[in-house]
Amino acid sequence: MNVMLALLTNTLLSTLLVLIAFWLPQLNIYAEKASPYECGFDPMGSARLPFSMKFFLVAITFLLFDLEIALLLPLPWASQTDKLPTMLTMALLLISLLAASLAYEWTQKGLEWTE
């Protein structure tokens, strides 16, 4: 019963905060809030220029590989466990997945963002 009450309270509170955050900015619409800000000076150009989608994909790929490298960091400590064959198999699978992912990105020209 206490868990259900806590879940209901958290759900209602978070819903209320989301609704307030959604409706509050619509009350004060000023032109200054919609304009870009460059250190107090007038903008030199348009700040609403689109960026390259290829660059975005390279950045996402970098983040994914960085996260997978973080999975490899505990391997030296994991090698001291009793289940060494299981650890080596999992490490080999993870490294194989990284190599296959890199090869796929390379063949699909996903690492080239200049056009």
Swiss-Prot record:
Core subunit of respiratory chain NADH dehydrogenase (Complex I) which is composed of 45 different subunits. Interacts with TMEM186. Interacts with TMEM242. Core subunit of the mitochondrial membrane respiratory chain NADH dehydrogenase (Complex I) which catalyzes electron transfer from NADH through the respiratory chain, using ubiquinone as an electron acceptor. Essential for the catalytic activity of complex I. Keywords: Electron transport, Membrane, Mitochondrion, Mitochondrion inner membrane, NAD, Respiratory chain, Translocase, Transmembrane, Transmembrane helix, Transport, Ubiquinone. It is a multi-pass membrane protein. It catalyses: a ubiquinone + NADH + 5 H(+)(in) = a ubiquinol + NAD(+) + 4 H(+)(out). GO terms for cellular component: mitochondrial inner membrane; respiratory chain complex I. The chain crosses the membrane at residues 3-23, 55-75, 84-104. GO terms for biological process: mitochondrial electron transport, NADH to ubiquinone. Pfam families: Oxidored_q4 (PF00507). Belongs to the complex I subunit 3 family. Its EC number is 7.1.1.2. It comes from the Eukaryota. The keyword Translocase applies. This is NADH-ubiquinone oxidoreductase chain 3. It comes from Felis catus. GO terms for molecular function: NADH dehydrogenase (ubiquinone) activity. InterPro entries: NADH_UbQ/plastoQ_OxRdtase_su3 (IPR000440), NDAH_ubi_oxred_su3_sf (IPR038430). Gene3D superfamilies: NADH:ubiquinone/plastoquinone oxidoreductase, chain 3. It is found in: Mitochondrion inner membrane.
